[in-house]
Amino acid sequence: MGKVLSKIFGNKEMRILMLGLDAAGKTTILYKLKLGQSVTTIPTVGFNVETVTYKNVKFNVWDVGGQDKIRPLWRHYYTGTQGLIFVVDCADRDRIDEARQELHRIINDREMRDAIILIFANKQDLPDAMKPHEIQEKLGLTRIRDRNWYVQPSCATSGDGLYEGLTWLTSNYKS
């Protein structure tokens, strides 16, 4: 019955896994979306999970810590994921190759084959931040032909680009 009502009234739920290297801005994004304000964060050991409702869609967002020692645990969160939000610190040119390797490791896992991919090109407010087209190239996204992906420029602290990213997820998710 719930599925019938959600079809009629347009309420959808989406399981989102938010990953990225440490200090990319994942937790800041999660709580900016949830609370509408910037919060002081500490490095996430483990995960945060929150439900964010936007445009009649309930996003169940799992924000998992990004330190290199925690990354092997990411795969334990893959099952049932419908959308991947991969957050990149656009000012961190030294680690963009590391980000690319991690992204491709995630999306090549069979548990993630059906997930659509949103890249938040975060920290666009910082000087010398890489622009979306540069992120697209450096992450090797143009070679991904069999998946639905999108790069959204963002600034977690101001909220710029965050809701546009959620809009893309709602428009491209097929339940």
Swiss-Prot record:
Q: Name one GO molecular function term.
A: signaling adaptor activity
State the compartments where it is located: Cytoplasm, Cytosol; Cell membrane; Endosome membrane; Recycling endosome membrane
Which residues are the lipid attachment points (N6-myristoyl lysine)?
A: K3
Q: Where is the lipid attached (N-myristoyl glycine)?
A: G2
The chemistry this enzyme catalyses reads: GTP + H2O = GDP + phosphate + H(+)
Q: Which PROSITE patterns match?
A: ARF
Keyword Nucleotide-binding applies: yes
> What does the similarity note say?
Belongs to the small GTPase superfamily. Arf family.
The record's listing under NCBIfam families reads: small_GTP
Report the protein name in the record: ADP-ribosylation factor 6
Q: Which organism's genome codes for this protein? A: Homo sapiens
